[in-house]
């Protein structure tokens, strides 16, 4: 018996009117390669199997609540331009209505996961107590909407950078009372994450760094940050939470230099303080670009360390030098991302979070769908091409050939430590390696072209029938 997709209307979400009338009640679906309809996928077909697994399982997409629902497209030169009919007064009533709109958006867009900061979902109120009371009030609605839709929480986090008290940092700040507030927010979100079934819990140290070295006690700040994370680990264990802890590296902005600069720096810090086994990395494309690294570098480091825990799917504006959070629109970047993800066996319980926003000129509600649809299609192109490369095996064969000399007696002797230093040096004296005979060309350009070729061929023969993901099917 064929499984039937569930049909939900805006009324099922408790909304009085449709916030997205331009969709005419029709969710975004796959309509075939080359489709030019702005509210349809031309490459992302969620239920289609790639390498034996549905596409939506390879690409666990998540909506970023802060950009999608709260972002008004303001910048340092002017106020927001975004037209968001659901944005009203900063009240609990409006917060609840906004949440209903958010879940309706995800349902219509076909996004299975969502991610949020504590300050995204409710007003702060007059103090921390009121803030946390507001969170307690909205949690039942979160559970109700998750049950209605099958949408799950990819990760929760705490905003420890926006409140004025965090101007000098949170866990690395100069005042213990600020540290205490930061930990109270973190503890609360650990509790919330457990209640709503969050898969992960992200730590991003937006102001955990410095702006002036002249005034810095580096050792004190590093110890305080380590203690903060250690206490989070302890509290997670105390309450029996199962979330995976993730740290999101970023080199700068808003501080001059942040302590979670890149994945290798994060690993060194975690290992120094005995925390490496408790955390993985949430790698953002734009953040990697800010440290002048391609995102596949950061992904490869994380994967090699066994610490690839999630991805923020966006990209920067080349040459700008700041975190512009554009939607991913370059299929070749997507391809390099997916090569690493497939080689890693996926993201485990991690998600690909659309930490991205429309441009200031793209201010209408429909632009939220246009941008997410384009980003999801871009990743799908990357997945299809990466899968084709994996099936053909040419890159794997080239890598095996490249490092084959390490399978020789000399290579094994060095790697295993079984060859004495004198014997190693005698081997060096006995043979002078020559380019072309002992050391072959790597043919790098030809291997780069394999990616172009795969992107050209990956959609040949793809059928145009939409296949629903199981999470959207009727019981």
Residue ranges of each PLM-predicted region?
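N-terminal small/glycine-rich loop or linker at the start of catalytic domains
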Residues: 57-89, 157-173, 205-212
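Conserved, mostly hydrophobic/aromatic
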Residues: 63, 106, 182, 193, ...
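N-terminal basic, low-complexity leaders that serve as flexible interaction/assembly modules and, when applicable
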Residues: 2-85
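Flexible, acidic glycine-rich loops studded with aromatic residues
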Residues: 306, 320-473
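Gly/Pro-rich active-site loop or hairpin
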Residues: 73-97, 216-222, 256-268, 279-280, ...
């Amino acid at each position: 018996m064929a499984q039937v997709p569930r049909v939900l209307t805006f009324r099922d979400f408790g909304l009085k009117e449709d916030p997205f009338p331009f969709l005419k009640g029709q969710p975004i679906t796959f309509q075939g390669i080359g489709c030019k309809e702005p509210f349809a996928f031309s490459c992302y077909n969620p239920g289609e199997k790639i390498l034996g697994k549905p596409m939506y399982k390879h690409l666990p997409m998540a909506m970023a609540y802060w950009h999608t629902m709260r972002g008004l497209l303001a910048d340092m030169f002017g106020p927001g331009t975004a037209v968001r009919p659901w944005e009203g007064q900063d009240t609990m009533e409006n917060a609840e209505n906004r949440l209903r709109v958010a879940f309706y958006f995800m349902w219509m867009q076909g996004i299975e996961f969502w991610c949020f900061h504590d300050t995204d979902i409710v007003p702060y109120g007059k103090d921390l107590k009121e803030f946390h009371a507001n969170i307690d009030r909205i949690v039942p609605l979160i559970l109700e909407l998750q049950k209605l839709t099958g949408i799950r929480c990819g990760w929760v986090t705490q905003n420890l950078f926006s409140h004025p008290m965090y101007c000098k940092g949170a866990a690395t700040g100069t005042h213990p009372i600020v540290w205490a507030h930061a930990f109270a927010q973190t503890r609360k979100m650990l509790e919330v994450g457990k209640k709503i079934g969050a898969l992960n819990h992200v730590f991003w140290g937006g102001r955990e760094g410095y702006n002036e070295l002249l005034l810095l006690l580096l050792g004190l700040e590093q110890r305080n940050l380590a203690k903060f994370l250690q206490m989070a680990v302890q509290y997670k264990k105390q309450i029996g939470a199962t979330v995976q802890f993730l740290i999101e590296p970023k080199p700068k902005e808003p501080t001059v230099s942040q302590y979670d600069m890149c994945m290798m720096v994060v690993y060194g810090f975690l290992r120094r303080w005995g925390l490496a086994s408790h955390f993985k990395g949430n790698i953002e494309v734009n953040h990697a670009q800010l440290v002048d690294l391609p995102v596949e570098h950061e992904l490869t480091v994380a994967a090699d360390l066994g610490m690839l825990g999630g991805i923020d799917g966006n990209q920067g504006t080349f040459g700008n030098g700041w975190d512009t959070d554009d939607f991913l629109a370059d299929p070749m970047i997507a391809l390099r991302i997916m090569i690493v993800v497939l080689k890693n066996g996926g993201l485990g319980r991690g998600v690909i979070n659309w930490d991205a926003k429309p441009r200031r000129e793209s201010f209408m509600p429909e632009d939220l769908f246009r941008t997410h649809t384009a980003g999801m299609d871009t990743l799908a192109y990357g997945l299809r091409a990466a899968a084709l490369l994996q099936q053909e095996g040419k890159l794997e064969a080239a890598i095996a050939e490249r490092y084959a000399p390490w399978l020789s007696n000399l290579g094994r002797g060095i790697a295993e430590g079984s060859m004495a230093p004198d014997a190693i040096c005698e081997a060096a004296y006995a043979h002078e390696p020559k380019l072309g005979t002992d050391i072959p060309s790597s043919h790098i350009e030809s291997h780069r072209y394999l990616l172009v070729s795969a992107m050209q061929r990956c959609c040949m023969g793809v059928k145009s029938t939409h296949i629903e993901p199981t999470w959207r099917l009727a019981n």
